[in-house]
Design a protein with these regions (language model features):
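Membrane-anchoring hydrophobic helices of lipid-metabolizing enzymes
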Residues: 1-115
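Generic alpha-helical secondary structure signal
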Residues: 1-4, 39, 43, 123, ...
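Hydrophobic (often cysteine-bearing) scaffold residues that line and stabilize catalytic clefts
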Residues: 2, 60, 120, 147, ...
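Short Gly/charged-rich anion-binding patches and loops
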Residues: 9, 43, 99, 123, ...
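A non-catalytic, amphipathic alpha-helix used as a structural packing/dimerization or gating element
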Residues: 28, 42-47, 59-66, 70, ...
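Non-catalytic C-terminal accessory region of glycerolipid acyltransferases
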Residues: 36, 62-65, 103-105, 130, ...
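Catalytic core of membrane glycerolipid acyltransferases/transacylases, capturing the structured
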Residues: 107-166, 189-196, 203-205
């Protein structure tokens, strides 16, 4: 209940302050949270050291602080969903390689939109809607129903159709057969170790089977995309070339193909990778 009230208070504050002041307030509370968040500091430090084994503790700490601050700004943007419109998208968002979206849809086999807990993946769905592309996203439900409804109401207020994790398989397959776009977060398996084991930054971890599994079953293309925050708090939506499975692909080999792309972006923007839990096996 406390977390829900904090979200509601944060939402109210953000909706009544200019964006610049909302960000400043978010950074202040992020720094305060950082002091007391022992587990979050521990997990993020371990994850960053796995990616950058040669960096000093001071360098890791600097990245980690920026990560906490960026995540706080991510929440500000998410709370502001009801007032984000096409004017905002036009002013604050640049889309790179937009042609890859049409290229993927032209195959008429559906598109698995593959992203990560990087930058602002939630805003990515809103941008696709603003560009005129119907969009479905698989979301992990919160244990607290009020928090779950709070998040989903904001997603759906901007045309992002939410598919609850646990009920996703049949609906995703059906949507892909209708040449729709289905978004999945591909950098963390939430199915109690039922994912596929892959090497990620040279260490074993579980990644979800969903993106590769759906692509292999339907012939859908996997379209990697990442909404990255820029230093001036604008965004760039980076689209990568669609990945098409070949006759020899398995879930493991196809997962490795897009895992390499996620590695590249996470390494380039580690201060925007919000993995506040143990990642590797």
């Amino acid at each position: 209940m406390l977390n829900y009230l904090l979200y509601k208070i944060g939402y109210w504050v953000v909706m009544h302050l200019p964006l610049k002041f909302s960000y400043a307030l978010a950074v202040f509370f992020s720094d305060l949270h950082y002091v007391f968040a022992d587990k979050d500091r521990k997990y993020t430090s371990g994850n960053l050291k796995a990616i950058f084994p040669d960096k000093t503790d001071k360098e890791i700490r600097r990245i980690r602080i920026r990560m906490f601050r960026n995540f706080a700004k991510y929440l500000v943007d998410f709370f502001r969903f009801p007032i984000i419109d096409e004017k905002y998208v036009s002013r604050y968002v640049t889309v790179k390689n937009k042609q890859y979206i049409e290229q993927a849809l032209s195959k008429k086999k559906g598109v698995v939109m593959l992203t990560a807990h990087l930058g602002n993946w939630e805003l990515g769905g809103l941008v696709f809607g603003a560009l005129g592309y119907p969009f479905w996203a698989v979301a992990l439900p919160h244990k607290n129903k009020k928090i779950n409804d709070f998040f989903n109401n904001r997603r759906e207020s901007k045309g992002v159709h939410v598919i609850q994790f646990g009920k996703a398989a049949r609906m995703c397959l059906s949507l892909l057969k209708e040449n729709k776009m289905v978004a999945l977060v591909g950098d963390k398996d939430y199915s109690n170790e039922a994912g596929v084991v892959v090497d990620f930054f040279g260490r074993k971890t579980y990644l979800p089977k969903g993106p590769a599994g759906f692509a292999l079953k339907t012939g859908a293309l996997i379209l990697p995309g990442f909404m990255i925050r820029n230093p001036d708090d604008t965004y760039t939506l980076h689209m990568e070339k669609p990945i098409e499975s070949n006759g020899g692909d398995t879930i493991e080999t196809l997962t490795l193909r897009y895992a390499a792309i996620m590695e590249r972006y996470i390494k380039q923007y580690p201060q925007q990778w919000y993995m506040f839990r143990q990642f590797w096996i």
